[in-house]
Regions:
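C-terminal cap/loop subdomain of S1 sulfatases and analogous C-terminal strand-loop tails that border
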Residues: 37-68, 79-89, 93-171, 186, ...
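Active-site-proximal N-terminal segment of extracellular/periplasmic enzymes that hydrolyze or transfer
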Residues: 2-7, 177-185
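A non-catalytic, amphipathic alpha-helix used as a structural packing/dimerization or gating element
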Residues: 182-196
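Histidine-centered active-site microenvironments of extracellular/periplasmic hydrolases
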Residues: 1-75
Length: 202
C-alpha cells in the first residue's frame, strides 16, 4: 500500500506540469525522481524492492540501473518545440546546474567571497531537448562503496566491495550479461579511469 500511494502521488504531481511563474511566463520544470524507491528493502524486503524497479536490477543506494535510473520531464513550450518525445542518452544530476545556467543566460561564478569555486562538471541538456544526442561522455558514481563508471555504451559496476561487472548498455541495459571476460581491455580501461577519479575526489 505504501508503494502504491507513492506511485499515485507521483502521477498527480506530474499532472501539475507545466508550471507558470508569477509573471505568467512558461518556465522549465523538471520533476526528477529520487534514484530508486525510498528505503524499500527496509519496508518490504530486498526481493520486492527489486520488483519495484523491474526490469532493472537492484534499488536505491546501488549503482546498477535499478538504483540510479530516474525519469526527467522537461516542459518549456517557448523553447522546447518537441512534444511527447523520449530521449535515451544518459544524463546525470550534475547536468541540471549546467542546463539552468545555459537556459537562463547566466554565467557560472569562478569565485565566491575570495574563494575559488570548482568548475561545473555537468553538461547542459539543452541539445537533447531538440533531438537524441549520442555523447561518449564519462560518468561516475559512488555511494556506500557501491561503484560505477560509464563511458559511451560501456558500464562497469560493482556492489559494495565486490567484483566489477562489465555491461554493454546498448544491448543489455538490464545488466544481466557480464562481459568482463569477453572484453578484458575495456574492463581494465574503465577500472583504471575509476581509480583515477576516486583518487582525485577522495
Amino acid at each position: 500500500k505504501n508503494h502504491a500511494r507513492k506511485v499515485v502521488t507521483m502521477e498527480l504531481q506530474t499532472k501539475m506540469v507545466p508550471v507558470r511563474s508569477r509573471e505568467g511566463h512558461p518556465v522549465l520544470t523538471g520533476p526528477q525522481a529520487m534514484p530508486g524507491p525510498s528505503a524499500t528493502y527496509i519496508a518490504y524486503g530486498k526481493s520486492w524492492a527489486n520488483v519495484s524497479n523491474t526490469p532493472f536490477r537492484h534499488y536505491k543506494s546501488k549503482n546498477h540501473e535499478g538504483g540510479i535510473s530516474t525519469p526527467l520531464i522537461a516542459h518549456w513550450p517557448k523553447s522546447i518545440t518537441a512534444k511527447n518525445e523520449l530521449r535515451s542518452q544518459p544524463g546525470h544530476l550534475i547536468d541540471i546546474m549546467a542546463t539552468c545556467v545555459e537556459l537562463s543566460g547566466a554565467s557560472y561564478p569562478k569565485t565566491y567571497k575570495g574563494n575559488k569555486i570548482q568548475a561545473m562538471e555537468g553538461q547542459s541538456l539543452t541539445k537533447s531537448f531538440a533531438k537524441n544526442v549520442n555523447v561518449d561522455r564519462l560518468l561516475m558514481w559512488e555511494h556506500l562503496h557501491n561503484r560505477a563508471i560509464r563511458l559511451g555504451k560501456w558500464k562497469l559496476v560493482a556492489v559494495s566491495r565486490g567484483e566489477w561487472e562489465l555491461y554493454d548498455m546498448e544491448k543489455d541495459r538490464t545488466e544481466l550479461n557480464d562481459l568482463s571476460k569477453e572484453h578484458p581491455a575495456k574492463y581494465e580501461e574503465l577500472k583504471a579511469l575509476w581509480e583515477k577519479h576516486a583518487h582525485r575526489t577522495k
